[in-house]
Regions:
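Short runs within selected transmembrane alpha-helices of multi-pass transporters and secretion channels
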Residues: 71, 139-158, 166-174, 195-210, ...
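Residue-level signal for short hydrophobic patches within transmembrane helices
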Residues: 9, 13-32, 36, 59, ...
């Protein structure tokens, strides 16, 4: 009998796409949280506020990546147990993960409130936007508990094959976010603080909704009294996956943060261009990023169920799908780079538009590289090799950071040199990841024979 959310049966390509589509839409809505702030702030307040929100978003993603990494790693464990049909281990891992990530959330919150000022100074945030950026982040982190709750339960539901339910709660919260943005900024004139407050309240709605749904509609995922224990084997498994995935996410966002610091040194105009272009960039490769996450769940469930033949067929199918889609998006972004920048920037801000268009055309030409890299990350996490995902992340980000600082320092490089360092990092990690997959695939098949 086919279980709800079972990814070990059915056609591979159809199963992957059916599972991925709600995740893509959900990620689109997640991006809309910050896009709503960026769009309204940029058009209604000005370039300084746009630069503040854009830089704040980069720092916010880096800090929250700790929680997202823990949730993602736990989700892999959930998928393995669900695929194997071990519901006792599944419930115990849910309880242990919830407590672990909850404690980390509290620690992170306290750390941000204590060290936010020194962090902003370390990032060379210009004085004219320092106050706006500080107040924005302070409000955002007052609601970090909502970020933890939503992402934990969304990860849990996706791990057991339900990618639709998290989408519904996000849809409601995004509509609320945009409405509150307009009300707080245009009607109450709260400025950048209003944008932050709107995001926190909207995330609170999503968090409350998803936790109520899970407890009422998915009783098999609700832990019982006997599950409320810290089993050593369970904790070791969660720690192994979650810690390495957390390290991967943190390293990834640390590299981005270091590049943000370098970009900040070029002034407010370049910061504003980077903030707007990164939002467009995130939307452009967001579908293949979510496809990689869905692919990871697919692989993990089949790995837990021992369906190794299905895993290898899934790899081939996913690779072709990701490459075709990435090439299509590359063409669209390259052709429409300037109109896309005008969504966030006023037409008279020509310097910002020119810098942003250059960024988009360089990155857009290589979306195939990041698409393949997301598949490699997901594959290695799912087959109990999260360490390899970390290696690829360090390789990609390390190359990116070293090259960006070097190219920015030479006369021929400058800001454009920073942009070129990003796809070069993707491609180097792709080559290593694919080579190791081909080697490991042979060993993997041999060991399971």
């Amino acid at each position: 009998m086919l279980r709800k959310g079972d990814l070990t049966q059915g056609g591979i390509t159809g199963t992957l796409l059916h599972f991925t589509l709600p995740m893509m839409v959900g990620s689109f809505l997640q991006q809309c949280y910050n896009i709503a702030d960026t769009l309204i702030v940029g058009q209604c307040i000005g370039a300084g506020a746009l630069a503040a929100v854009g830089s704040a978003y980069t720092l916010m993603v880096f800090l929250i990546s700790v929680l997202l990494g823990l949730a993602m790693g736990s989700g892999t464990v959930f998928s393995l147990h669900y695929g194997a049909g071990n519901h006792v281990a599944l419930r115990r891992s849910i309880f242990s993960s919830f407590v672990l990530i909850g404690i980390v959330t509290l620690i992170l919150n306290v750390a941000v409130f204590i060290w936010l000022g020194p962090i902003l100074r370390l990032l060379q945030v210009p004085q004219d936007i320092y106050g706006m950026m500080r107040s924005y982040l302070w409000i955002i982190f007052c609601g970090i508990v909502f970020t933890f709750i939503y992402n934990f339960y969304a990860s849990l539901l996706r791990a057991v094959g339900d990618s639709v339910t998290p989408l519904w709660f996000l849809a409601v919260s995004v509509v609320l976010n945009i409405a509150l943005d307009l009300f707080f900024i245009l009607q109450l004139d709260w400025g950048i603080q209003g944008a932050a407050a709107a995001t926190v309240l909207a995330q609170g709605v999503a968090a409350l909704g998803i936790i109520i749904y899970t407890y009422r509609r998915r009783p098999e995922l609700r832990w019982h009294h006997e599950d409320m224990c810290f089993d050593r084997t369970c904790l070791k498994e969660i720690a192994s996956f979650s810690t390495l995935t957390c390290v991967q996410q943190s390293v990834m966002n640390l590299g981005i943060l270091m590049i943000q610091g370098l970009v900040n040194s070029f002034g407010t105009a370049v910061m504003a261009a980077f903030a707007a272009a990164v939002k467009i960039d995130s939307f452009a490769y967001m579908p293949v990023q979510e496809f990689g996450n869905a692919f990871s769940t697919f692989i993990a469930q089949n790995f837990g169920a021992g369906r190794y033949d299905r895993i290898h067929r899934g790899v081939r199918s996913a690779f072709v799908t990701a490459v075709v889609f990435s090439l299509l998006v590359s063409v669209l972004v390259f052709v429409f780079a300037e109109p896309l920048m005008l969504i966030f920037v006023r037409p008279d801000e020509t310097e910002i538009i020119a810098v942003g268009v250059t960024y988009l055309r360089i990155e857009g030409a290589f979306y195939c590289g990041i698409g393949i890299l997301f598949l490699l990350y997901g594959y290695y996490r799912a087959i109990r090799m999260p360490g390899m995902s970390v290696v690829l992340t360090v390789l990609s980000l390390g190359t990116r950071v070293v090259l960006s600082y070097w190219l920015a320092s030479v006369p021929e490089g400058g800001v454009t040199g920073i942009w070129w360092s990003i796809p070069i990092g993707w491609l180097i990690a792709d080559v290593v990841g694919i080579w190791y997959y081909r080697y490991k695939k042979f060993r993997f098949q041999e060991s399971k024979a």
